[in-house]
């Protein structure tokens, strides 16, 4: 296996796009578009993708992926996102909370019990929150 130092400089990883297993694609797409504000990037009868900003997720009906997957994604303003999603009726597990890894996060549960953690950088001097795991 090659050492990291020997890889060419022009090979760069950009971002990962998780594939989440879902039971009902229509229900999932409705939640992500109507409640969470994502847009459908493309859709097939058993497979689809949504996008919001540079965050993309894929959904597969009863195929790829596993139930109860956890996703972590950075966001520019976690407090504004929390207020938006609270107003739209999102299933919020934890409001904005500060963590020792210098992150302020919210946690949302989707219809297939996937836990979505969205985070922004912690502001200096803010106190830490409590884990709910």
Pin down the residues of each PLM region.
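N-terminal beta-strand motif that seeds the catalytic metal site of vicinal oxygen chelate
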Residues: 1-29, 56, 69-71, 120-133
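Conserved short beta-strand elements that form part of the metal-binding/catalytic scaffold
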Residues: 2, 39-70, 115-120
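Vicinal oxygen chelate
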Residues: 15-23, 49-51, 62-88, 104-109
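Conserved active-site tyrosine of GNAT-family acetyltransferases
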Residues: 28-33, 85, 110-113
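Conserved acetyl-CoA-binding loop of GNAT-fold acetyltransferases
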Residues: 35-40, 89-91
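Short, basic/aromatic recognition patches
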Residues: 93-97
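C-terminal structural segments of small proteins and small subunits
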Residues: 101-102, 119-121
